[in-house]
Amino acid sequence: SCHDLLEIMLETCPEGMFIPAHIWTPHFSMFGALSGFDRAEECFGELTPYIHAVETGLSSDPPMNWQLSALDRFQLISNSDAHSPAKLGREANLLSGDLSYYGLKQAVETGEGLDGTIEFFPEEGKYHFAGHRKCHICLSPAEAEAQGGICPVCQKRLTMGVSHRIAQLADRP
């Protein structure tokens, strides 16, 4: 489990950083529609205070994440996947502190020296909207709700997108 993985990391390397990545990816990420977690505390339990940052993923940006007051205690970072050279650097973090492991750790833990993120367009993310890849369907949260979460082409369940999941959990505009 996520809790157990964090516990192992803390036992093995107390100076380590544990940053949940791609927190909104629909299937099995921390806040994915199928994860079973609506809050970090549900995922990490009593170890939640050791989580200082979350990585937002390509399909969301900081303003989308700011809709959840439950994320206020975390630094928001944005990293690029390294699946191909063309995708490197699409997202990045702006750092002004000491460029060392401990400087990065301080920025992640306190926000000092973490000056923001460089973001790609969330709409370009594979999971921004709800959809069904096989049928080439991509729907906004309102459209997905109107369809009852069902693909209008094949009648199978849609994969609910990041924007839909954030709307479900948001407690402010």
Model regions and ranges:
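Short, well-ordered beta-to-alpha junction loops that form the rim of enzyme active sites
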Residues: 20-24
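Short beta-strand/loop segments at the ligand-binding rim of alpha/beta enzyme cores
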Residues: 17
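Internal, well-ordered alpha/beta segment that forms a basic, Gly-enriched binding/recognition surface
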Residues: 10, 14
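Phosphate-interacting basic helix/loop segments used at nucleotide- and nucleic-acid interfaces
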Residues: 2-8
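Charged catalytic cores and adjacent phosphate/nucleic-acid-binding surfaces used
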Residues: 7, 26-173
